[in-house]
């Protein structure tokens, strides 16, 4: 997996004199996985690489939010050629979420 970008929205808010609870967007993925999906339907590139938002709510609890891979498959009308890759990506994303959140 490659981390392509990390965007600290709270730091960007502070840079313009605004406040925001910790909110970080991470763009990551595997070029092989993404290319398989884009071979099926090139518009999948709109939602790739994968992204996850780590953020703190008003109660001080931290959350990890990301797009559901089944949603991505429906959104881009991905066919059977992408099914195995979508499943592998779902499994990988669930593993990442468990690691990051400790759940």
What residue ranges belong to the model's regions?
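Feature detects long, helix-prone N-terminal segments enriched in hydrophobes
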Residues: 1-103
């Amino acid at each position: 997996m490659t981390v392509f970008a990390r965007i600290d929205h709270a730091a960007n808010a502070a840079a313009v004199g605004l406040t925001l609870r910790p909110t970080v967007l991470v763009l990551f993925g595997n070029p092989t996985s993404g290319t398989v999906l884009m071979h099926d339907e090139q518009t999948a590139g709109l939602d790739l690489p994968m992204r996850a938002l780590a953020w703190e709510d008003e109660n001080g609890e931290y959350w990890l939010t990301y797009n559901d891979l089944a949603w991505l498959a429906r959104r881009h009308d991905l066919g059977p050629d992408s099914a195995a890759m979508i499943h592998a990506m779902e499994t990988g994303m669930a593993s990442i979420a468990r690691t990051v959140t400790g759940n």
